[in-house]
From Swiss-Prot:
It is an enzyme of class 3 (hydrolase). InterPro entries: Helicase/UvrB_N, Helicase_ATP-bd, Helicase_C-like, P-loop_NTPase, SNF2-like_sf, SNF2_RAD54_helicase_repair. Its EC number is 3.6.4.-. GO terms for molecular function: ATP binding; DNA binding; helicase activity; hydrolase activity. Disulfide bonds: none annotated. This is Putative helicase 009L.
Amino acid sequence: MDTSPYDFLKLYPWLSRGEADKGTLLDAFPGETFEQSLASDVAMRRAVQDDPAFGHQKLVETFLSEDTPYRELLLFHAPGTGKTCTVVSVAERAKEKGLTRGCIVLARGAALLRNFLHELVFNCGTGGRYIPEGYADMGDQERTRKMRKAVSSYYQFRTYETFAKSVATMSAEAIRARYDRFVIVMDEVHHLRSVQAEGVNTYSAISRFLRTVRGCVKMLLTGTPMTNEPGELADVLNLILPQDKTIRPEDGIFSNSGDLLKPDELAERVRGRVSYLKAARPDAGLTFAGEVLGGTGMTHLRLVRLEMSAFQSDAYASAWDQDAGDRNIFSNSRQCSLAVMPDRRWGSAAEARNPSQVRRMAGQNLAEYSVKYDYLVRVASSSPKTFAYCEYVNGSGLSLLSDILLANGWRRATGRETTPGKRFALLTASQKNIHKIVQRFNHEDNVDGAYISLLLGSRVVAEGLTFKEVRHTVILTPHWNYTETAQAIARSWRAGSHDRLKARGEAVAVTVHRLVAVPRGRDTPRSIDSDMYAVSEVKDKRIKAVERILMTSAADCSLLRSRNLYPSEFDGSRECEYGRCAYRCSNVSVEPGPLPALLGASAAEAVAQVRLDGGGDPAIMKVDMSTLWAEVTAGRRYVNRWGDGAVLRAEGGRLELSAPYGSSEEGRWGDFYKTRNLCYAKMDQDHLRADDLRDSLPQEVEELLTVSPVETIGETASAMPQEVATAILMACVQARADGKTLNVVRRDALLDFYKGFYAMGPSGWTVWLHARGANAKVYDGRRWNPADEDTLEFLAARSAKFTDTRIGYYGLYNPNLKDFCIRDVTQGKRDKVDLRKLTVGRRCVDWDQRTLVHIVARLMKIDGRRDFMPHATLREMRELAEQDPLHEPSDLTSKEACRRFLFWTQKGDNKFRRQDICKAMEKWFIENDLMEDNFDCGHQHKRRGKFA
């Protein structure tokens, strides 16, 4: 039977198939729906199973990878689930595989883009390769500029407004020339319709752009695609739906008022283009204070009811009357429910306040003027870290609250704090250093709010930012839709936001306080807060009904069902779309079993049937089709009825056990196609070189051991395939152990080069080059054996010497590149399943100055020259150290500590370069036996399995 390279493609189901496709590659999953086929994909299931918290990121990366035909996706993932890092994993893979030429990130404002850039550089598994040299010593503007430059070869960042203006005047040819084969990311895409650009319809310009480009991967990011009504979803989906699936008004899917009329039609149109992920389970630490208020019409929202004082109630009644003529704004009532000045002014009139009025409010009777601010101050005073959200800044809003806090003894944070204190930070649109303040708030030394314990945020922080270790979130102002409130809450309840508390063994708990100010007395106006929450709940129920349709029809519905399915105790809750938590995925008739079973019995039974009958019709086999086709595409070997090696192959709509390759391909390329899931188009120079190496390798090994220069023999050996380099090292170790005297000079040169990869163990000479644990080999004087239990304990103890070091860091040395790296193990032993979470070594000169000083001065305690400040007093040295923003309290405890810190942080001509500090650290690691040889040191693409 002839072999086609298509026999070795990794197959994924197409969204739709025509009659002409039946029995061909495009009909690789006959009789199965797209969703049913995808539900059993091994790679995607493995990603979710191995990492329940972040496996969705690997799932989406695989879904949009070079192996699949899928190129657009609405990433409808709840706020705080790590959408940015999901996108980065897709973009980085596309870059590595050559699938795309670049990545353009579009967002509503510069703040969101800066946050995306920061996440890309520091938090999304990019290994530090985008961190600019000298980052720690730069100012804020220079940091942003250098980070943009570091990623500029692949990433571009534009606001919706500026990008729309740019592409609106470009021809289709110009757009394709510049943006074909790009990863296109649209962050918080639900805002696109509301963005205004002078002289340009922003939505139309970007929609045209998306329909013009070719070969692109398109990702729309949102945690809230609908804000006021379900019909808003159409504008979002139409950006990626093909022309024949576009949702038009005349289709009648949504009514003119935005209600969903045809749920089945909506589900059909979005098939294969939505990924849906809920937030962590409601019982995982997020709780809501208060209760459902009676007499409001609300059924689900738990609110904190606060009764206004008689003084505030009287002012509120006047404010309500002033709003009577404009029932759509209620600005007076809303401002008055926040706070009333002692002279009975509120809102814009409160801007004319004087210090004595503020001091009067800030005293013991704050509740007299603001029942909400009094509640917040009491919460913040007893909580390590608190976040308060308020729509209003001026008038009775956050500006007034800031003045009250200052009068109460709080200090305002700047982001440069070096000493503990009772501080708050104000984050508004006028702030230029929001990210600096947030970074200081999130710093590891502020886990318990020692430097900043209270954040006051306006709408500018409602999206994109993460506030870590917050214990209490206080919502001061509701909104007419609940989406705004949910976004604010998500700032302090996000993926990884409380990991440091978990690491300390503490229970993670965030309490949300949604405040409702209610006027005192019977004949008083209604509470505007209560009215707004009631309206938002009604809207939210309509939106959640549509959200459930998207969840059940999502491409990854079955794959993420374990994450999205909440316990039945939450039936009827908002978290379960106000209905039953249990649900079924559309077009998935049978949920695949656990992964081990998926790959086991069912496929084996089908193969046995094919072996017996000589072939079979997949459509009538009692087996999950995706499982069978996974066997086909993997090229897995079986034994046919005659005892010969064979593979499952699709032929004319049947499955057959066939020879791996035809007799005409027995030669050079037969072995190539037996072992690689590739098509001809994917062959590159690396594959050709690898095949050529198979013929030339024996000669190269012979030359290495006979005529190669001794000075470069190690570098030459390390460039060979891993298994060859390992075999050479094992032969050299055995030759020395057996007392061989032939070719001693070259043998010893190789042994010296690889000295960090072998040692005498309890059972004999042990080699672990390119191998760990049970893969290591042991020479007992007669033969090489797998590592036994004693050897495994020996290797584990050797590894523990590095990972359990008292200073939390150890050195790595690449004997080939002569590079020195440092690995951070301060967080202890990591999860050995999720390799992405492992810390790996980074070149010493790439670490920031603050961390290097911390290691060399405080952990290693390397003293400086004896003649450095020999006569200075402790007081004099403390005064100098306190002027340096890098200093910590421990640097001031003794003359020795102070002198060390001042020595390593000298300024001007005496300033130590990173290279100088690294030389001292390298020497210390060697002297303390904490330097490990590792060939990944100095490489961007590290194999994390080596660090597990």
